């Protein structure tokens, strides 16, 4: 009985130690994305502050659509060191292991349109960072739909900040 209680306490202590650190306080150190300590912490490839929607759309080209994506998962977030002849074989088959989260997969994306102002004589510059605070990506124009897919991937996207 005494062994099981100490094993339980040790297990709980190991769980607490393994938890990721809590979120930093608002405005404190570490609350930004590492580029001037500003913005969303989930944005890996930031874009310049003075880039407009028109410039970003031109960078994407005519074969891709400028999009704002709420979620992005990048490969290389985890690293597993496997030893032995068949070390890691099962984990690689079931989809875990190094880079298991994908190769820059973007999810929950919405289209960013270039809005033409009503008054043509007044130049209005829509800054891309004002339109989208999440991941800005160039998504391939394709008629595919991922609504009822098993994998759920419809549009291959590339982070805009990675091609600048």
UniProtKB/Swiss-Prot annotation:
GO cellular component terms attached to this protein's record: extracellular region; fungal-type cell wall
Glycosylation, residue list: 50
Endpoints of the signal sequence: 1-18
Sorted UniProt keywords: Cell wall, Disulfide bond, Glycoprotein, Secreted, Signal
UniProt xrefs under PROSITE patterns: HYDROPHOBIN
Subunit text: Self-assembles to form functional amyloid fibrils called rodlets. Self-assembly into fibrillar rodlets occurs spontaneously at hydrophobic:hydrophilic interfaces and the rodlets further associate laterally to form amphipathic monolayers.
Protein name according to UniProt: Class I hydrophobin rodA
